[in-house]
Amino acid sequence: MGIGKRAWQVAGAAAGGASLFGGGVAIGRLLRLDSQRGDYRRSWENHNLATLERLRQLDEHPEGESPYLIVSLGDSSVQGMGASRVTKSYPARLASAITQQMDREVLLLNLSLSGATIESVELTQLPQMRGLGLLDGPYRPDLVTLTIGGNDVMAEDMAPGQFEERLRRILAALPSGALVSTIPSFGIMPQESRAQDMSDRIRAAVEDSDAHLVDLRSLTQEYSLPTYTFAYHAADFFHPNSAAYAKWAQLFADAWAESRREPAPVAEDAPQWDMLSARVAQSEYDD
């Protein structure tokens, strides 16, 4: 998928328009960011295949306690779009932080999809979990994370009520204790009111379930507009950057630890996640 019209609109509105895009440097950064879609997807696919093979090996030849399995669902923010490296995505940072606090091997499957909406989670990612034996089969995860809604905010044909209905069905299907995030602030964009409405619905659905809320929205609303725009966004002014994902990872780590009634690991202190992918080196970009 090429650079969308919304990326240019978001960038223009956030930064005052064409001045940021007058030079080839800014355009080049946007083009490099767009190429992340394929590179990051392939890195995660390669990693997921290796992780599934590891699970199968442990099934056949157990090595003590089974691994702590994390499954991440959602959109391009879960893929790590905007980070300088796929290992700086929040799922990778979270997995590394959890590893530091456990005496078990930690495995991560990232089934997210760039461009995903709530419909994508219900109609593609949940069935994928089921097909891989992650819902009713032998590889039931210890933790599921879900970040979704940013693309739904931009989709005018997605009614907030319909979004909530689908989310409630998803939460009912997931294992207990899932970590579900609200939608980050849209700043001065006209879709901000929809983002607030949908985030309120996420909060209500989570409160009615056995999942736990990760309030990305409150975090992003704390920043001044210039700080949020320029310090915590990638070149398209839509996706988070590495610095933002570090903050996200800590919020997820805090929620995870709180659900277990134990101190939270410090995500920033955790080493780079050792992905089981031969394609990680292909995922290096400037923030």
Label each region the model flagged:
Residues 36-112:
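Serine-esterase "nucleophile elbow" of acetyl-processing enzymes
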Residues 71-72, 108-112, 143-147, 179-182:
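Structural recognition of the beta-strand scaffold that forms the well-ordered cores
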Residues 107-109, 177, 210-212:
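Conserved beta-strand segments of alpha/beta enzyme cores
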Residues 120-162:
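Oxyanion-hole/transition-state-stabilizing segment in secreted/luminal serine hydrolases
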Residues 147-151, 170-199, 218-220:
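Active-site segments of SGNH/GDSL-like serine hydrolases
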Residues 188-287:
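Catalytic His-Asp segment of secreted/periplasmic serine-dependent ester chemistry enzymes
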